[in-house]
Amino acid sequence: MDNNIQRLIDSAKQSLNSHESHKYIDESFESCIKCTACTAVCPVSRNNPLYPGPKQSGPDGERLRLKSAELYDEALKYCTNCKRCEVACPSDVKIGDLIVRARNNHLAQSKKPLMNKLRDAILSNTDVMGKINTPLAPIVNTITGLKATKFMLEKTLNISKKRTLPKYAFGTFRSWYMKNALQDQQKFERKVAYFHGCYVNYNNPQLGKEFLKVFNAMNIGVMLLEKEKCCGLPLMVNGFPNRARNIAQFNTDYIGKMIDENGIDVISEASSCSLNLRDEYHHILGIDNAKVRPHIHMVTPFLYQLFKEGKTLPLKPLKLRVAYHTACHVDKAGWAPYTLEVLKKIPSLEIIMLPSQCCGIAGTYGFKSENYEISQSIGKNLFDNINEGGFDYVISECQT
């Protein structure tokens, strides 16, 4: 016992003297008043007895982790990074950010099973997988939809066979834009830049086309960044912080170039991408994005501002009853009221705002076999509200 204590003391001294251990320290945890409001709203704590909750994993754990790198906790992997803990925190402690950084450090020091590491790399490297699969989309989509394929993916990579994998588009949004839209966008005097992200580029180009239609209808042209990569969020939460940091710097540089050369704002319709570009690049990865942050916008607050400026859209009545689900990262950023105000512009549309709660999928989290039951349990109340509501459609900014 004495030897173990001495070993921890020696390790703590070495850790405290290391510059690297303090490189991205967020000292906001000292503001924690131990009210446990974060634990009360945590969707994982309510559904997984193995997770101690955001207070213990975040601020409480951080005090220990600063003393010794050995005091990391395997339970950190259960956090979904929904950030509802940060919304609830009266002291503005970046609880989710503390947990993500600690988890990445823990994964770097522990031995993750090889197949799980391969799975996480596949799920996280969305640009790589998109470039490989979009040219072969009809074949890939057919194969990944087979029961035999799902069975093999679960047995080998621990990807749940109960999940439906996203379908790939046959051709990217970016290639469509360059061939069919680029020239037409030059006629508009006012322009915005569009950060389309992975989902639009590889899975749902139609969403990007609709984005263009909306802004063009307001007499605003849409440009693309000269280059862009995945926002890096999947890499950041799955134990690949160095690669995520390189991507974050790449995107920040090209967003900065667009702003410097054209003086226009950068818009994204993806809530997690928007939050990552604006906040997490700095908070979690240590990227200096202070210059570009004021010019990066989520689409609905930006549209709301355009309406205030007097811009209009030729909207036809839509006699539908729709449910609005506040995505986790929308809740964190406070964007939901803007989305609701934009939706209210549509004549005859009845909007029912669902109680704000996590859907459980959390990007790549819910695709993992070990998380499937937990993710379904987290989302159950939301699913029940939707199924019992008799809605024509469900609206959300969350692409997953």
Question: What function would you assign to each model-found segment?
Answer:
Residues 41, 48-50, 176-179:
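Short acidic/polar alpha-helix capping motifs at helix-coil junctions
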Residues 17-29, 65-77, 216-218, 345-348:
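Short, intrinsically disordered, charge-biased short linear motifs at domain edges
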Residues 26-45, 71-93, 129-130, 202, ...:
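Cysteine-centered iron-sulfur cluster-binding motifs in ferredoxin-type domains/subunits
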